[in-house]
Amino acid sequence: MKPYPKGDDKGWPGWQFPATDQEYPGANPDPLFHAKYLHELYFKADPEYKGRYSVPVLWDTQTDTIVNNESAELLRDLQTGFNSILPESDAGITLYPEQLREKIDEVSDWMQRDLNTGVYKAGFARTQEDYDSNVPVVFAALNKLEKMIHANGGPYVLGKDLTELDVRAYATVVRFDTVYVQHFKCNLGTIRHDYPQINNWLKNLYWNVEGFKETTDFRHIKENYTKSHGDINPLAITPMGPWPAVEEGWQPQVEKIRVGGVMMPKVLELEAELGP
């Protein structure tokens, strides 16, 4: 999909497919139906559809319909949904290992609510009061994540095992300094300056773990926000920085890195409410 334009303030006509591979690098035409708009697929699946035309979308070519469009569910379902056609070695790979499921579920709850969704609550606030109440929540979650990575010894959120939590956190953290600090005004701190543990974790995923860098396109990320939200950025000017988008220099020994955080009293109060 092209990151912009997405249409009017009600989302019509919504996400567009490029006509060719060259129209917008990194965005591909619809290979199944050659649709121009994503909404065409929603109406193909259900002619009476009344909801939003959102991504991601998982289309089943056997039943010829959308089977899921919820990212959290897809993150879980794709781990096992195709095991029957995968080699045994690949079918055994999981980001939701049984021994860590209770902890993953516990962390996922506040991470989704306060961090993944939290940046949008802050960024789309319509009043100063709403903005002021939502921004500290985001940084309380980042403070907690910072300490968790350090306490578990890295290189991942829960220690030596790559889990769903790393995927969930990455999607927000990799965008944070690039988009959320300026576009959503989440500017109490930055990942690279205020969260050295998270920054080190990000460096490892982006530069060392296959699949993360390859699926991250900073032009798409920036233009998806800066050229789509006319009420926030009416001139649609896209900032150049930060540079580099993700720093290099991963330190495998997390104990050698200081534990950072935003020390604003309201942030610390909300962090404490998240528990130990």
How should each PLM-predicted stretch be described?
Residues 1-276:
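C-terminal alpha-helical interaction module
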